[in-house]
Amino acid sequence: MLEVISIYGFSTFQDLGRSGFYSKGISRSGAADYYALFEGAALLDQDPNSTTLEFIGNGGTFNILEDCMVALTGATMPASLDQKPLDWNTSHYLFKGGKLNLGAPQNGRYSYLHLRGGFSAPKIFGSSSAQPSAGIGKYCFPKDILAQLEKNSELLKCLSIKPFDRFDSTTFRLVKSFQTNLFPSETVERFTETEFSIDNQSNRSGIKLTHTGSGF
């Protein structure tokens, strides 16, 4: 069990998402980085659909209220327990009274804190994935208590995992659509040769890209 002291960016509960509700205007939601959920599940020997805490852009600080086991996956953040560094893509035991701190991601945008037994969160349409813009779930805030869904007394070794390589690519694929031919060929060529960077205003709905020079 954890208590939120501070959240530096945006953080929500996520699992593998919900499907079959587009006709009702409800998107699938779910973790932005599915690989991270499976990596966390492997480290903690649990269901990949277990509820995890997703961080966008920055991490947070947490009080450890009960002994527990966690795993850290996704975009690498500087992590520490009582100011002692913690390895990423690794499972760790956290002991009552400690303080966990997660910083800003260094090689991606979405980072994940997994709790053995999963976090306890309401199931809405079969999923605990939050989508605050649709009134489903909420962001995490200071003083929130993040409880464990299932208690498991079986002891596990702390493990590390080599993550699937997905953070070093800097190339985007351009998929032409029925409107592409409406742009002059010179504009399309300039677009494909332009270097973009990720804007801080990005969110779970999409990643905003910025560039220097005139628009398209």
Task: Write out the residue ranges for each language-model feature.
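Conserved "landmark" site that anchors the functional core of diverse proteins
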Residues: 1-216
